[in-house]
Design a protein with these regions (language model features):
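Short "lid" loop at the C-terminus of a central beta-strand within the Rossmann-like core
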Residues: 70, 92, 115-119
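Helix-to-beta-strand junctions that scaffold the AdoMet/dcAdoMet cofactor pocket
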Residues: 32, 104-106
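Conserved beta-strand signature within the Rossmann-like core of class I S-adenosyl-L-methionine
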Residues: 107-117
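Conserved beta-strand segments of alpha/beta enzyme cores
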Residues: 36, 61-63, 109, 133-136
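SAM/dcSAM-binding transferase cores
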Residues: 121-173
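Short amphipathic alpha-helical segments
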Residues: 51, 97-101, 123-125
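Conserved SAM/SAH cofactor-binding pocket of Class I
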Residues: 1-91, 97
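Conserved nucleotide-binding/hydrolysis micro-motifs of P-loop NTPases
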Residues: 44, 116-118, 142-143
Length: 173
């Protein structure tokens, strides 16, 4: 559903924030070898596993980075560099939007794959503050996991430099 709802040009850049075991980032790299996919995770052990997996699968289009989202989004080589950022169960939508939208360049999309109780409306204030606008919310069903949602936010303006904040500051709101 992700590649159906987010049309990415040839050679597009993607970052999977809080990738965990590499889903959906590794799958995107397999399905679209033209994409340049960055897998970002805060646990070095996971990054090591993903590097080995990408090497065994011959995925030259995968780069693995060990960093927390709020730190990685401050790095010039990652900030506002991606056509698409994606994430799954990292945090609630307002927090996840603050973590992910700073990675997306203007005109790009943040695509959140969330559970059935999450809504685009929950991220609307954060999206506006961070230079984005809600462009879609679709429900879909996974055979073994039930109903899910894909929430899409288009980046329309640069994210102010103070974002993302440290996780303890974000979660206090």
């Amino acid at each position: 559903i992700l590649l159906q709802k987010v049309q990415l040009p040839l050679g597009a850049t993607c970052i999977d924030v809080g990738t965990g075991a590499g889903f959906p980032g590794m799958v995107l790299a397999l399905l679209r070898p033209d994409l340049q996919v960055t897998l970002l995770d805060s646990l070095q052990k996971r990054i090591g596993f993903l590097e080995q997996t990408a090497a065994k699968l011959g995925l030259a289009n995968v780069r693995c980075i060990h960093a927390r989202a709020e730190d990685g989004a401050k790095l010039p080589e990652l900030r506002e560099q991606f056509d698409m950022a994606t994430a799954r169960a990292v945090a609630a939508m307002p927090v996840l939007t603050e973590y992910c939208l700073p990675f997306v360049k203007q005109g790009g999309v943040f695509a959140a794959m969330k559970g059935p109780s999450e809504t685009a409306e929950q991220a609307e204030t954060a999206a506006k503050l961070l230079g984005g606008e809600i462009v879609g919310e679709e429900s879909y069903t996974l055979p073994t996991a039930g109903e899910r949602k894909l929430i899409r936010i288009r980046k329309t303006a640069p994210t102010p430099q103070k974002y993302p904040r440290r996780s303890d500051k974000i979660k206090k709101q």
